[in-house]
Amino acid sequence: MLFRSQHVKGPNLAPGGSYFEIARCLNFWQNSAIKNLSLQVEYNGGITKSYPINNAWLVGVDYFIHSKDFKNTLNLKALYKNIQEKDSDVPMQLTAVWAMNDLFGVKGLKFDGFADFWWETHAVDFREDGTCDTKKTVFITEPQLWYNVGQHFGCDNLSLGGEVELSNNFGSTGGFKCRPCLGVKWDF
């Protein structure tokens, strides 16, 4: 389904929206000098009440860095990004994904997250008269901090913590935004 109008009249009285992403790193040369370099393929897309998330196909390279015990990891990605029916000055996305387990030597304390930057010509800040602003880049990062409280009573899947979404020109909102969130997490 493609949306032609992005202006929504009336109150939004219900939660709405879906987003789907699948990404895979392909590496068939793990016993070589370039073992940390992988090919990545990815798809993302979705729908919300206030703005579309057009189908996007990404392909590129992923470079994997880790500590000797794999408790700390970092993936750096440079991806070609094709967004259906969208213009882009540079059809590319740069991504970093990290995880730090047992942070500061505290068993069960985890700091992880991602940061994405890409070029996409898109509408933001819709006004009552139907006009809006246009932006050409998007940045979003969601660093998370979790503590495994379940380890203290035999339930290793349970963590408490949260994240802070920091974004610039993300979704239908122009400019910089900070959105903190507390959470309870169950690891499957």
Residue ranges and their predicted role:
Residues S5-K9, V41-K49, I65, A78-Q84, ...:
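Transmembrane beta-strands of outer-membrane beta-barrel pores
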Residues M1-T48, L58, E142-Q144:
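Transmembrane beta-barrel domains of Gram-negative outer membranes and organellar outer membranes
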Residues F3, L26-S38, I65-L74, N101-F111, ...:
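Short loop/turn motifs that connect adjacent beta-strands in outer-membrane beta-barrel proteins
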Residues W146-F170, W186-D187:
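Long, ordered, amphipathic alpha-helical scaffolds
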Residues N54-P143, Y147:
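Detector for outer-membrane/organellar transmembrane beta-barrel domains
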